[in-house]
Amino acid sequence: MLIDSHIHVGQYYDQYHSPADIVRLADDVGIDYLAVSSTTMCDEDYEKVLSEIQELKGLLGDRLLPTMWITPFGLEGNIAWFLESDIKWSCLKVHPFLHKNDWLPAGSQFAEVIDIARELEIPLLIHTGVDECCRSSKYISLMSSNPDITFILAHGQPHEDALMVLNNCNNAFVDSAFMCLQQMVEIVETGFANRLLWGTDMLIPSHFSPKQDMVCYYKSKLASFKKSVSIQDYEQVTFKNAMRVFRM
């Protein structure tokens, strides 16, 4: 089995990744279940985002784990479009790098998102990176004060910060989207194979490597990881952890 916990549909700069593109990738690679959010959300186009997720649901059925991407502007009222839809959401997502002055760990906006995650009983995915606004360690207090919520640190960056968070917060996971193989293996060897989720950010890599075949890219990274860890750890990362996180 293979579960990809970090995939995108929608508009990304000059590229548009349609629901059909995502389904084609999933079938060609052999992804059994996939957690998908829409990058069209960057344009605050709620109607389009819902349309994309609905179309994906029609194409993938129960294979789809819909991720609700929440923006600060959306919290002011438009989030009702998502909450009142007939979509059974599997995960929430926020992107502090895109809204540097809004997603403060102790702020009211994060508190509201936490309340939604708690009400829906689903995990919260947070984009992390090397910038101060979204470092993994920035959210330790948030995770510690909400032990009943499962947090996914997308990308798990900076790497040293992510390891520190995993060591201090039992409700924290990281995903491997845009994470190099060496860092993935180090997480496993450090004893956190049960807290790493397979995620690829597909089809975003095609923006940075437009000439590369994405199916080959995907299969190559998956094969390299499989060769680098035990079969038990490989299965833990590629589907067993996700089954726990998404309550499958």
Name each model-derived stretch.
Residues 1-5, 16-33, 118, 211-248:
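Mid-to-C-terminal alpha-helical segments outside catalytic/metal-binding sites
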Residues 3-7, 34-36, 64-68, 90-94, ...:
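Hydrophobic faces of well-ordered beta-strands that scaffold small-molecule active sites
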Residues 5-8, 14, 20-44, 63-71, ...:
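Divalent metal-dependent hydrolysis catalytic cores, especially in the metallo-beta-lactamase
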Residues 6, 26, 53, 92, ...:
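Conserved, mostly hydrophobic/aromatic
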Residues 11-17, 40-48, 70-78, 99-106, ...:
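Acidic-and-aromatic substrate-binding clefts and catalytic sites of carbohydrate-active enzymes
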Residues 42-46, 104, 206-216:
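Short, flexible/disordered intra-domain loops and linkers
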Residues 48-124, 170-173, 187:
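Active-site gating/metal-coordination segments in enzymes
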Residues 104-198:
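Catalytic pocket-lining loop regions of alpha/beta-barrel enzymes
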